[in-house]
A protein has these predicted regions:
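Flexible loop and strand-edge segments within Gram-negative outer membrane beta-barrel domains
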Residues: 219, 235-247, 253-306
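N-terminal periplasmic "start-of-domain" segments of outer-membrane beta-barrel proteins
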Residues: 37-67, 97
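Hydrophobic, lipid-facing positions within transmembrane beta-strands of outer-membrane proteins
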Residues: 39, 96, 157-159, 176-178, ...
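A beta-strand signature from Gram-negative outer-membrane beta-barrel systems
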Residues: 132-179
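Extracytoplasmic beta-strand/coil segments of soluble accessory domains associated
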Residues: 75-116
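Transmembrane beta-barrel strands of outer-membrane/channel proteins
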Residues: 180-184, 208-214, 264-270
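Surface-exposed beta-strand-turn/loop segments characteristic
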Residues: 207-244
Length: 308
């Protein structure tokens, strides 16, 4: 009986060994000669200057960051940059200049959409006349910028304050963008503005932006009649501080492809600003006034050359 059981065990082991061989032969092999095509995916974005990849010290504010600052003019936002001195020559409508490393305003160039701005009247750029309503990005470069495609004046300056305006962007199925704002504040401040963007075709876009601001600027101050603590004082209002400005911009944008863009921009600005003086011997009369009219047209063409 034991021999029969042993014989059956050997037969069972022999059958299991030889019957398992065809099971391995039935496994499917991967066909490595076949080519599988993956659909093409195109990802596009607008080039923006970033602090993390800049070789020179760079500070910038995006449009979202400028909204959080609650600033009215470019001069108000520039004060939040580190290592910058914004000189204010008095009054709401006074001249406001920017300097880096205490080198003076003449060593800091102000660029508007990549074009250097000049002022033959004073030799210094008044950054108080630029509004933030049409600004997309505000950057300050301490030293040479990483952008090699810029005017020679940018390379010869100690710092660059670059103002980039908004480029029209449209959502899918939308061809018109209209934005209006109205701001008001103390001392008679009234500041309405409007922005219109229209897509003429897939390649051509036009935009127009206008702004008007008015303020009497008659803020109160305390006039002391002597240096002693018990001397008489009176509350006065600053005179000759009225400001009225008007700004208009129009732009034509050509987006021929992802590697070829062209823009044409026209800018006009005029202002009437009173310049108050210090109260000397209780005399607060001032009649000095400043009128400005600035206009320029600039064009920019940016092709991307490949296969060099």
């Amino acid at each position: 009986m034991r021999y029969v059981t042993f014989y059956m065990s050997i037969c069972a082991a022999f059958c299991c060994q030889f019957l398992s061989i065809p099971l391995f032969a039935q496994q499917q092999k991967v066909d490595t000669t076949h080519t599988y095509f993956i659909p093409e995916v195109t990802v596009s974005d607008i080039y923006q200057t970033r602090e993390v990849r800049s070789t020179a010290p760079l500070q910038l504010f995006s449009k979202e960051a400028l909204k959080n600052l609650h600033a009215l003019q470019v001069s108000d936002a520039v004060k939040h940059f580190a290592g910058v001195t914004v000189k204010d020559y008095g009054g709401i409508g006074g001249l406001k200049t920017v300097s880096i490393r205490s080198l003076g305003a003449q060593h800091t160039v102000v660029g508007y959409d990549g074009i250097a701005i000049t002022d033959c009247q004073t030799g210094q750029i008044d950054i108080g006349r630029f509004s933030l309503d049409n600004v997309d990005q505000l950057s300050l470069s301490n030293g040479q910028s990483d952008n090699i495609f810029q005017p020679a004046r940018f390379f010869a300056s100690a710092g660059i304050l670059d103002i980039q305006t908004l480029t029209p962007r449209f959502e899918k199925g939308k061809r018109t963008n209209i934005s209006a704002a109205f701001k008001t504040g103390s001392w008679g401040l009234v500041n309405p503005s409007i922005l219109l963007e229209q897509q003429l075709s897939p390649q051509w876009t036009v935009s127009a932006n206008g702004e008007w601001m008015s303020s009497d600027g008659q803020y109160p101050y305390t006039l002391r009649y002597g240096n002693a603590a018990d001397d008489l004082t009176s509350r006065e209002k600053r005179k000759n501080t009225d400001v009225e400005t008007f700004r208009a911009e129009a732009g034509l944008y050509g987006n021929f492809s992802n590697k070829e863009q062209w823009r044409l921009k026209a800018y006009y600005f005029q202002s009437s600003r009173g310049l108050p003086k210090a109260t000397t011997l209780y005399n607060d009369f001032s009649a000095q006034h400043l009128w400005d009219k600035n206009a320029f047209i600039q064009s920019q063409y940016k092709p991307q050359i490949r296969n060099l």
